[in-house]
């Protein structure tokens, strides 16, 4: 079975991907990871992607589709997987339907203010990279890592103004995609503002549901 996870940054889809992957032996396929893997292995596509990224451009649909299709074909037959970060637009969605027509689409719904609170509160240790949150996972000493005692910092792209820009771009990019899947009654919406266990239960129900 194939699952497609759609949702803005901070919606929890990355966390849920790890949980489903570990508990149900699904393979987590991220386009970002595939790009890095191809660049690291210096494949023909990887070399092309590296040049594109170094120019500050977006990787074209044809390359993204090719990399995802190759990865899915390379997976052992009947292996379950989660697609994270693909498709991102109608062109990619139509291509996915051609080589993999029966995936389940799960859309993580969450209020923008909650996303901003979640991500703007994130703090990362400079020494050990452990992640904390000033709202949901506080440290004993303000600004100090509980694990190694290192200093905590806030990533530039976790600052409120940057987050608002990222969320605006996400909405513009995915709105046509959401409409595309809604029209053919394939979209499964999940409330991502609740606790992780509740989200997991809802996704398991979707996984068990017949197409």
UniProtKB/Swiss-Prot annotation:
GO biological process entries: AMP salvage
Name of the featured protein: Adenylate kinase
Taxonomic placement: Bacteria, Pseudomonadati, Spirochaetota, Spirochaetia, Spirochaetales
Domain notes: Consists of three domains, a large central CORE domain and two small peripheral domains, NMPbind and LID, which undergo movements during catalysis. The LID domain closes over the site of phosphoryl transfer upon ATP binding. Assembling and dissambling the active center during each catalytic cycle provides an effective means to prevent ATP hydrolysis. Some bacteria have evolved a zinc-coordinating structure that stabilizes the LID domain.
Native species: Borreliella burgdorferi (strain ATCC 35210 / DSM 4680 / CIP 102532 / B31) (Borrelia burgdorferi)
Family: Belongs to the adenylate kinase family.
Source taxon at top rank: Bacteria
Residues engaged in binding AMP: 31, 36, 57-59, 85-88, 92, 155, 166
EC number: 2.7.4.3
Subcellular location as annotated: Cytoplasm
């Amino acid at each position: 079975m194939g699952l497609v996870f759609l949702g803005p940054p901070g919606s929890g889809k990355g966390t849920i991907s790890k949980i489903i992957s570990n508990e149900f032996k699904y393979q987590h396929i991220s386009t970002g990871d595939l790009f890095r893997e191809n660049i690291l292995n210096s494949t023909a596509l990887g070399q092309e992607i590296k040049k594109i990224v170094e120019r500050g451009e977006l990787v074209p649909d044809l390359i993204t589709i090719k990399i995802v299709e190759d990865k899915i074909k390379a997976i052992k037959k009947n292996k379950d997987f989660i697609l994270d970060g693909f498709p991102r637009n109608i062109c990619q969605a139509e291509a996915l339907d051609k080589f993999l027509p029966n995936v389940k689409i799960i859309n993580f719904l969450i209020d923008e203010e909650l996303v901003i609170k979640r991500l703007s509160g994130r703090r990362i240790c400079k020494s050990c990279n452990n992640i904390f949150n000033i709202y949901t996972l506080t440290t004993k000493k303000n600004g100090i890592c509980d694990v190694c005692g290192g200093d905590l910092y806030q990533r530039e792209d976790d600052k409120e103004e940057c987050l608002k820009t990222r969320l605006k771009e996400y909405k513009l990019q995915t709105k046509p995609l959401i409409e595309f899947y809604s029209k053919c009654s394939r979209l499964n919406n999940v409330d991502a503002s609740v606790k992780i266990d509740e989200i997991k239960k809802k996704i398991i129900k979707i996984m068990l549901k017949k197409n």
